[in-house]
Amino acid sequence: MAMPLKWEFPGGKIKPGETPEHCLCREIAEELAIKVAVHHALAEKTHAYPEFTITLYPFVCTIISGTIILREHAAVIWLPREELASLDWADADRPVLEAYLQFAGQETP
């Protein structure tokens, strides 16, 4: 899904027989050339855009190896938690951000 000029979390489509966790690890390796460890699942979020509906399966992860190389994205940014809400997020990703900030003990503005 491409949302020009909007920030999105990395990820992609789940393949048949693949778990959401495995999908995320595979997609991050493909898109960013890094390996992550999945630590905590957040509640799935479904959003209806005018053209399609998407369900996101968010996870809290850490990078365990590699250096980020952008293979499919135009930009990447690493911010402190308290600055994440200042970005212009895609509509489907905003509830994921809110869930993450609640998990991390932050309030969203």
Predicted features and spans:
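Active-site-adjacent beta-strand/loop module that shapes the phosphate/pyrophosphate-binding cleft
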Residues: 35, 44-67, 77, 100
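Short histidine/acidic/glycine/proline-rich micro-motifs that form metal-
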Residues: 14-15, 47-48, 83-85
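Hydrophobic packing within well-folded, soluble alpha/beta domains
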Residues: 20, 24-29, 41, 59, ...
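Nudix hydrolase/Nudix homology domain
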Residues: 69-109
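Short secondary-structure junctions
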Residues: 31-38
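Conserved Nudix-box catalytic region and its N-terminal flanking loop in Nudix hydrolases
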Residues: 1-30
